Amino acid sequence: MSQTDPLTVLQDSLRGAPIIWKGEYPYFIHPIADGIPRMEAEVLRATRDLIVSMVDWSQIDLIVSVEAMGLPLLAAVGEATGKPTVVIRKRSYGMEGEVRVDVSTGYSSSTAYINDISPGERLLIVDDVISTGGTLEPLLESLEGMGAVLQDVIVAIEKGEGRVRLSEERPEWPIRTLSRIDIVDGKVEIIQ
């Protein structure tokens, strides 16, 4: 890939992404969302740089993301900013204060476990994709219930109406995305 502005790098990487169907659900395959096909370093760097440039870092105590595909973004943003990070895991560790959260995507359901987040901590939540909002919504509710401050929520790729729905139902949640896509005639289209 050639050097260009970060948003163009991310959007160009989305064009031509393969599409598979999981039942009635069209699923795009992209390295930010799936770890395959291989990710060019420029795509991760561009995505990281977009996130880093959007945040008032004086207002963030901790960066949080969900296993598994949020991890590359979490690590890259944490390293770039020097802020500590916590992973919301898909298995229990049985630690004191652990919070169990049931989540669902457009094609599956699972359980996540939140550890090591204290009341009053100002969080940046980063994630790879929002589609239905079925993962993000219960996680944000649980984090709020733990007393954490949802200072900022940035998702790399928006597909579907999940962010719009959550923004209408929970306008106090600061959910932003880097690039919005749709799948039209079996292909990824960039909306913004």
Task: Mark where each language-model region is.
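Short Gly/Thr/Asp-enriched flexible loops that form oxyanion-binding sites at enzyme active sites
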Residues: P72-T81
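Conserved G/P- and acidic residue-centered "switch" motifs that form tight phosphate/ATP-binding loops
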Residues: D128, G133
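Short, glycine/charge-rich flexible loops or terminal/linker lids adjacent to PRPP-binding catalytic cores
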Residues: A80-L123
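PRPP-dependent phosphoribosyltransferase catalytic core
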Residues: T4-P6, L140-Q192
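Conserved acidic residues
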Residues: D61, E121, Q151
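Short glycine-rich phosphate-binding loop at a beta-alpha junction
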Residues: I60-E67
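Active-site-facing substrate-recognition patch
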Residues: M1-Q59
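Solvent-exposed alpha-helices and their adjacent loops that cap or buttress functional pockets
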Residues: W57, I114-S118, M146, S167-E169
